[in-house]
Swiss-Prot record:
Record flagged with keyword NADP: no
Lineage summary: Bacteria, Pseudomonadati, Pseudomonadota, Alphaproteobacteria, Magnetococcales
Family: Belongs to the universal ribosomal protein uS5 family.
Gene that produces this protein: rpsE
Database matches in PANTHER family: MITOCHONDRIAL RIBOSOMAL PROTEIN S5
Gene Ontology molecular function: any one: structural constituent of ribosome
An individual GO BP term: translation
Domain comment in the entry: The N-terminal domain interacts with the head of the 30S subunit; the C-terminal domain interacts with the body and contacts protein S4. The interaction surface between S4 and S5 is involved in control of translational fidelity.
Protein name: Small ribosomal subunit protein uS5
Pfam families linked: Ribosomal_S5, Ribosomal_S5_C
Function noted in UniProt: With S4 and S12 plays an important role in translational accuracy. Located at the back of the 30S subunit body where it stabilizes the conformation of the head with respect to the body.
Length: 177
């Protein structure tokens, strides 16, 4: 098999993935050496299945496609499961913090859409949430915003889990919207 056929086969394989892949950021770094500058690239990728599983990854390489591939592989290994209410929003308001990044997530009524800025929107698109209100304060650094958003998503507790912790029936637990 020639190099060209291998390349084409890999491209087809990547496009047939069952995951939704969203590129969040690409950054170029420069190392100054005696002969000039050497450039490296870092990429942040969010991967989700559209049904409640999502992960993020950071890849670094000398070329952009290789950095994206590394980030995608890492994201697929670090996926978390998030409970989604009615297949479209989150159960309750939650706060996530990481570094200087603060994120507030609120459930939204049907038809609202994803009202989120910066690096948060690709996460909600990949996870399968279609109605949510999100606000970020502090930093606009994509690394910290993604980690803060994941911290907020991990704080979400569906009524069944809350009922089990309290020793109640699930129908007796009411989560305020």
């Amino acid at each position: 098999m020639s190099q060209r056929e291998k390349k084409n086969q890999e491209a087809v394989y990547e496009s047939e993935s069952e995951f939704i892949e969203k590129l969040v950021a690409i950054k170029r770094t420069a190392k100054v050496v005696k002969g000039g500058s050497r450039f490296n690239f870092s990429a942040i990728v969010v991967v989700g299945d559209g049904k409640g599983s999502v992960g993020y990854g950071l890849g670094k390489a000398k070329e952009v496609p290789e950095a994206i591939r590394k980030a995608t592989d890492q994201a697929q290994k670090q996926m978390i499961k998030v409970e989604i209410k009615d297949g479209r929003t989150i159960f309750h308001e939650t706060i996530g913090r990481f570094g200087a990044g603060n994120v507030v997530l609120r459930p939204a009524s049907a038809g609202t859409g994803i009202i989120a800025g910066g690096s948060m929107r690709p996460i909600f698109e990949a996870i399968g949430i279609s109605d949510v209100l999100a606000k970020s304060t502090g930093t606009s650094n994509p690394h910290n915003l993604i980690k803060a958003t994941f911290a907020a998503l991990q704080n979400i507790s569906p009524p069944k889990r809350v009922a089990a912790k309290r020793g109640l029936a699930a129908k007796n637990v009411r989560i305020r919207d």
